[in-house]
């Protein structure tokens, strides 16, 4: 008896199985965006407007506002403690909150898809508000971030300065170290995969542990603020504008920091220019 050729049938079966596996992986894989150190009202406006276009295009599953989202000019202790009264003219707590909502928070929420996990990290600048209330207790109940932005009511997860948010196998923190090897310092302290900002420039360090050869990576992100704010006084620095695109499942992730060197323009990981 001559057996019929089964090759084509087997090829189709293999192809179907492969397609099912690819679809399953696509369902499990999620996308995320992280934007750090905007320092409103000293944010890079052209970059922010182009970033919102990317948000609408990507429809991320997770968005991380990584801290120092607002500069908190009205309670800047570096200026107040040194009695630099002239630099405080026109700075008002409520005006900065209202401006942030109008220029950044409201447009962002409109661009994000329904069901997006929204994560808000306080940075050291948001923590300035608590320091100001410690010095001026009459501001309690009026000046706090939550009492003005109502983030929890708007569906945001909120984390105080020093806390972390976990997304898959990644910990998102604001960041705290400013030494030359801050990525290495962060990995050695946390012993996890950590994404952070605070330093306004990209840096990467990976350590492979002797236990099951598990890698731990620390990545510092570029910033979303102006490159030469007034307090810098034209001093040289290593700041870079940009943000993070990331993809993740429960077990794996890939990080794609995007830098914008010229006029808030950038090329996304997809190759599309904004």
PLM ranges: what are they?
Residues 36-39, 67-70, 124-126, 175-177, ...:
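Active-site metal-binding loops of divalent metal-dependent hydrolases
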Residues 63, 118-120, 218:
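Hydrophobic/aromatic residues located in beta-strands of well-ordered beta-sheets
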Residues 169-263, 271:
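Conserved beta-sheet core of the metallophosphoesterase superfamily
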